[in-house]
Amino acid sequence: QAVPGSASVTNGRRIFYHSPVAACSSCHRHRGRGNVVGPDLTNVSMQSDRKGLLESLLQPSLVMAPQYRPSMIVLKDGRNLTGIRLRSWVNEVLRDNKGKNRSFSRSDIEIIHELDESFMPNGLVHVLTDRELRDLLAFLEDSDD
């Protein structure tokens, strides 16, 4: 069993929204609260079991949905910008890791590289205690929240 023991949904909610260490809601939404950099985690427990959730927390770059794979844009003026590509047409729109959208003319772009590393750092959960990790997983699995 992934991280066995008792857990508190209430403490998990606090960790998700208010922990400066985990900072989950700085990138993820849950029930309409949080940021829009990474996937909305409202229904994540319907898409994965506890073991899958834990693996995503431990190794976020292992499996990334294509729409959340970061890209690096190199502009002709030498600047490098990293973000999630939102759309590409006449302008390239990139959402940075703070949730800010930036738009660039295709004519200003030298090259676009798709990256293999998620914005979510590997090992982020190692800064949480086992209890905090259980609480966070319980919150993400709770459908009554």
What are these regions (language model features)?
Residues 1-5, 58, 79-81, 85-91, ...:
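C-terminal capping alpha-helices of c-type cytochrome domains
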Residues 21, 62-65, 145:
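Generic structural signal for secondary-structure transition and capping sites
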Residues 1-19, 37-39, 49-55, 76-79, ...:
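Electrostatic cytochrome c docking/interface patches
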Residues 33-59, 64, 69-115:
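Gly/Gly-Pro-rich "capping" loops immediately C-terminal to redox-active cysteine motifs
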Residues 19-22, 44, 48, 127-131:
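Residue-level signal for short amphipathic helical patches enriched in basic/charged
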